[in-house]
């Protein structure tokens, strides 16, 4: 490919004055697929579909608000001067870690209100969340955001990427590292790992699937974040997501080890035990 063409149109559909962005379409598609998978996983673990749907109805708005709030806080120098853009979430600018914090709070409160084991629900959610993250990164691709440092055309061609993807990585007068793609692939590999190992019920105690997800995602995010040029910064020195990734990686592994040795009441998963666990806690 020798000719640089125009970037892909971020608008999927125009209905009069209404514009439907690809970013929103991709995120919405990721949510729909994740919900369907969560319901199936919930039934396998003995959690009623109604409980899954109710939790998601609460979690979605709070997740979105938390993800946007997190982003705005660390970009406050800009949004303080442009407050009208705070709500323009369709232009991009949501932080995954912020969304995970918001979703985690909702899950904990919801499970306590329904007497459902929190770790069980987090285990159900983990594969669906990382799959949604992997799909959602393509929204960043359409918006030409979450890209990396300047690279060469020959490097991108050496990755055997299609021309349309390479062309979209021509941003601000230079080709960029497709960090969105690296993270998307990492997330989908994590999804495959969790889906394959979740059947190994003798490996996991409740919460281990979720903690494995946290460690996996944090490990990959640390490296992809180091290649990005649009990182949220703390004191203009520390990449917020890298610092948080270190804490989450070591924290999740440490917590998994601690719970195995110091929390004997934490259940091992046994084949067919999901319904029994939920019933006992209700």
Curated annotation (Swiss-Prot):
EC numbers for this chain: 2.5.1.145
Any single GO BP term: lipoprotein biosynthetic process
Membrane-spanning ranges: 18-38, 56-76, 89-109, 237-257
Its membrane topology: Multi-pass membrane protein
Annotated a 1,2-diacyl-sn-glycero-3-phospho-(1'-sn-glycerol) binding sites: 137
GO molecular function terms attached to this record: phosphatidylglycerol-prolipoprotein diacylglyceryl transferase activity
Entry keywords, A to Z: Cell membrane, Membrane, Transferase, Transmembrane, Transmembrane helix
Enzyme class: transferase
Gene Ontology CC entries for this record: plasma membrane
Function of the protein: Catalyzes the transfer of the diacylglyceryl group from phosphatidylglycerol to the sulfhydryl group of the N-terminal cysteine of a prolipoprotein, the first step in the formation of mature lipoproteins.
Family: Belongs to the Lgt family.
Protein name: Phosphatidylglycerol--prolipoprotein diacylglyceryl transferase
Higher taxonomy: Bacteria, Bacillati, Bacillota, Bacilli, Lactobacillales
Gene: lgt
